[in-house]
Amino acid sequence: MSDSIISFAAFILADAGLEITSDNLLTITKAAGANVDNVWADVYAKALEGKDLKEILSGFHNAGPVAGAGAASGAAAAGGDAAAEEEKEEEAAEESDDDMGFGLFD
């Protein structure tokens, strides 16, 4: 549970535009009445050192829908031939999985 509390503290610091340091993380957790080991604060501070937490989170939000929408619009623009080629590629990929011998229920 300590890691969750430290994560939320890091989000609070990032939102406030403050530097994510071990001391700042511990200050927020103590103000919230949570007892957190110093180790967790040190680990998170070192992991997030020099990184923009807001940029990391916005990158996850933007990456998913853009990739899916681009592939869907490309297939629609190319017409039925692209869809048929995609199906052939998927079938080939499924067949190659069978050849590996890793089937659990074969």
UniProtKB/Swiss-Prot annotation:
Phosphoserine: residues bearing it: S96
GO MF annotation list: protein kinase activator activity; ribonucleoprotein complex binding; structural constituent of ribosome
Main location: cytoplasm
Transmembrane annotation, as ranges: none
InterPro entries: P1/P2_N_sf (IPR038716), Ribosomal_P1/P2 (IPR027534)
In-chain residues carrying the UniProt-annotated modification N-acetylserine: S2
Bias (Low complexity) ranges: 69-82
Keywords annotated in UniProt: Acetylation, Cytoplasm, Phosphoprotein, Ribonucleoprotein, Ribosomal protein
Subcellular localization(s) per the UniProt record: Cytoplasm
Further facts: The 4 small acidic ribosomal P-proteins from yeast can be classified into two couples of similar but not identical sequences. Each couple (P1A/P1B and P2A/P2B) is distinctly related to one of the two acidic ribosomal P-proteins P1/P2 present in multicellular organisms. Present with 22400 molecules/cell in log phase SD medium.
Name assigned to this protein: Large ribosomal subunit protein P1B
Source species of the chain: Saccharomyces cerevisiae (strain ATCC 204508 / S288c) (Baker's yeast)
Taxonomic lineage of the native organism: Eukaryota, Fungi, Dikarya, Ascomycota, Saccharomycotina
Gene (name only): RPP1B
